[in-house]
């Protein structure tokens, strides 16, 4: 019998227990077949890293929403996607892969650091339409239910229309509703400064925290993801796996 519901693989970088991933499952569980494979603990900032030198563990967890199967993985978000496709979904390819909902902004250059985006990029490289959802609200207990309508609209659009090959979506919600609507926009040119907090332990050795402040390098631009979320819009940034600078290539001589 043909499967009537779309199959969606869900992962994140905040861990299988995170509020954001549970909220996403609640949004989708009534009309999608879902599988959750997510890190056993927070893996923020792991981007597209995978475990090349250590073995991985999978552990079955309590179901979400009564019948949504949940597994935790000892590795990175990308490991979760790779293992899920190989161990659980070899006979039925997902219609969609989703990373999120992330607790924190993944616009601008955060796109490159984000494990949530790592999920979407890995899905994209596996030729599966993929989306990353993030909220600019960093509170791990934040009420994310206001994101429901926006998430469902994007998911349904991608399931119906698909995405270009090697393109995934980076979707960022403002910290607080109401949301003014959607903006298709480009990635903001930004950077991190003052990133290292150097401290001295009471036992005498030095140690360091990676902290930092985000700097918008084009604050006047109005076509960027940062502008959109700062002005109450849901930012949708199509992200290509191919990062070649074709303009530079046109003029290359050596």
Label each PLM-derived region with a short phrase.
Residues 7, 95-96:
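Structural motif
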Residues 144-254:
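Electrostatically charged, flexible surface regions
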Residues 10-17, 110-111:
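Short, glycine-rich nucleotide/cofactor-binding loops
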Residues 105-114:
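Glycine/threonine-rich flexible loop motifs
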Residues 119-123:
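Hydrophobic/aromatic ligand-binding patch that stacks against planar heteroaromatic rings
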Residues 124-146:
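Glycine-rich phosphate/pyrophosphate-binding loops
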Residues 88-94:
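Glycine-rich phosphate-binding loop signature in dinucleotide/nucleotide-binding domains
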Residues 2-4, 8, 19-87:
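A cross-family phosphate/adenosyl-ligand binding-site feature
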């Amino acid at each position: 019998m043909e499967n009537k519901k779309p199959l969606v693989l869900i992962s994140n970088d905040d861990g299988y227990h995170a509020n954001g991933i549970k909220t996403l499952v609640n949004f989708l569980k009534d009309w999608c077949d879902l599988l959750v494979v997510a890190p056993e603990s927070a893996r923020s900032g792991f981007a597209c890293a995978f475990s090349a030198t250590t073995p991985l563990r999978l552990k079955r967890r309590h179901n979400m929403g009564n019948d949504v199967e949940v597994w935790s993985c000892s590795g990175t978000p990308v490991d979760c996607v790779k293992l899920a496709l190989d161990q659980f979904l070899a006979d039925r390819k997902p219609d969609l892969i989703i990373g999120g909902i992330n607790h924190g902004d993944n616009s601008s250059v955060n796109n490159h650091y984000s494990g949530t985006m790592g999920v979407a990029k890995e899905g994209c490289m596996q030729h599966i339409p993929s989306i990353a959802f993030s909220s600019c609200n960093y509170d791990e207990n934040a009420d994310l239910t206001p994101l429901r309508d926006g998430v469902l609209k994007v998911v349904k659009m991608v399931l119906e229309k698909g995405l270009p090959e090697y393109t995934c979506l980076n979707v960022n919600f403002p910290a607080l509703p109401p949301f003014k609507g959607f903006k298709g926009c480009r990635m903001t040119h930004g950077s991190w400064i003052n990133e290292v907090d150097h401290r001295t332990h009471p036992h005498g050795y030095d140690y360091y925290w990676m902290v930092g402040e985000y700097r918008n390098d084009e604050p006047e631009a109005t076509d960027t993801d940062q502008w959109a979320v700062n002005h109450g819009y849901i930012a949708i940034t199509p992200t290509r796996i191919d990062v070649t600078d074709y303009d530079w290539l046109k003029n290359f001589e050596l």
